[in-house]
A protein has these predicted regions:
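N-terminal secretory signal peptides that target proteins for export/translocation
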Residues: 1-39
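Short, flexible coil/linker elements and helix-boundary hinge sites characteristic
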Residues: 3, 31, 50-51, 94, ...
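A residue-level detector for conformationally permissive "hinge/kink" positions
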Residues: 23-35, 43, 47, 51, ...
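N-terminal secretory/targeting leader peptides
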Residues: 65-157, 164-366
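C-terminal segment of classical bacterial N-terminal signal peptides
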Residues: 44, 50-63
Length: 366
């Protein structure tokens, strides 16, 4: 069972079965469509207040040769999100002699990542960056990026994202959502951040960790004895402080930014995931570009993504060192044994979710 926790009232919790499935039947898709419609009402209201509503200022000028893109993201000014977006903006301005310009709106001013993705689905926002785990309701394929221990190391991760398999996954997500995946950001190495010391796998038993409610994650961590819990991002600190949860699965950069180490000073170096973030564009906006503009945008997107990943990896390493400097305790943990324990449960859920073919392709990348 997956725990849903309200840290301000720990008695208010509920559980959902891990058998919860991705919507595949017509009736499920109908319900999802209804939910999306309701969610879009909020998303479009946000878009309207910032001048990005479809039909008003989508970004396309009267001239087919000129375009102003609006790019929303959830990061602050010094994150790889912002720095990568700025790189893309500058490359486009340079390569198109100013025909394609970009306005960047960070700090979630257009809503959280799922809301911005919904705006793109509706054609109300041109571009954004989104975590794959937040769009699995819309794209079953995006679940592949939520599988723990998917990559052998950073080199493998890079080759997957930059190679044919990464392109295939991007195309599948694009086909499922009508939002084009241009390239991949990311690069944070995820670890176990806890108020309790985790130095052996036995220490995981009964540990309540905040995680995203995606099935591969839930199944894997339950196999390790963890109690996966869902807590709103802004309430994690308080939830740990009050003892509602023991910690979370997170990368060093955001552990440092959110000061989680103040209440959860133990970091077990599980490196069970290297984050992937999707650089996306509304299909409607993409279709308004001519062939040469599309080519230029794709080239620039890949350049900006490579730069953003480099920045993210560096920030991640720097943050881990800073966390240790500020008193966080780093603990080695048996990653090989962890992978052995989760292998069979993950094999079953990967097959059940129809991800085996693409998972095998990812693992086969050399």
């Amino acid at each position: 069972m997956l725990n849903w926790i309200n840290p301000t009232n720990t008695s208010l919790s509920r559980s959902i079965s891990t058998s919860t499935s991705i919507p595949t039947s017509p009736s499920q898709r109908s319900r999802l469509g209804s939910r999306l419609g309701k969610g879009l009402g909020k998303s479009l209201a946000i878009a309207a207040t910032t001048g990005t509503l479809l039909g008003a200022t989508l970004g396309v000028s009267a001239s087919a040769q000129a375009m102003e893109l609006r790019f929303g993201h959830a990061g602050t000014e010094d994150t790889a999100y912002q720095l990568g977006a700025e790189r893309l903006r500058d490359l486009l301005a340079e390569k198109t002699d100013g025909d394609i310009t970009m306005t960047i709106m960070g700090n979630s001013v257009l809503g959280h990542e799922t809301e911005m993705f919904e705006q793109q689905m509706a054609g109300a926002l041109d571009m954004s960056i989104v975590s794959p785990g937040l769009i699995t309701d819309f794209s079953p394929t995006a679940n592949v990026f939520t599988i723990p221990f998917l990559y052998r190391d950073v080199d493998h991760w890079q080759k997957v994202l930059d190679g044919d398999v990464g392109q295939e996954i991007a195309q599948k997500i694009s086909d499922e959502t009508d939002v084009k995946v241009l390239a991949y950001f990311g690069g944070g190495k995820r670890h176990i951040v806890s108020s309790r010391e985790v130095t052996s796998l036995d220490d995981l038993k009964g540990l309540k960790l905040r995680t995203n409610p995606t099935k591969p994650l839930i199944v894997a961590w339950q196999a390790l004895g963890v109690e996966p819990s869902v807590v709103a991002w802004k309430e994690i600190y308080t939830a740990i402080q009050l003892g509602a949860i023991h910690g979370l699965l997170n990368e060093p950069e955001w552990t440092l930014r959110m000061r989680f180490h103040e209440v959860a000073p133990n970091i077990a170096l599980s490196e069970h995931d290297i984050t992937v973030r999707l650089l996306t564009m509304s299909k409607m906006s993409w279709d308004n570009l001519d062939e040469q503009q599309q080519k230029t945008l794709m080239e620039s997107a890949h350049d900006a993504a490579a730069y953003a990943r480099k920045v993210q990896l560096e920030q991640d390493a720097d943050a881990l060192a800073e966390l240790e400097k500020q008193g966080a305790k780093l603990h080695e943990i048996d990653r090989e044994r962890m992978q052995e324990i989760v292998a069979e449960p993950l094999k079953e859920v990967i097959a059940e979710m129809g991800l085996k073919e693409i998972y095998d392709k990812v693992r086969a990348v050399k």
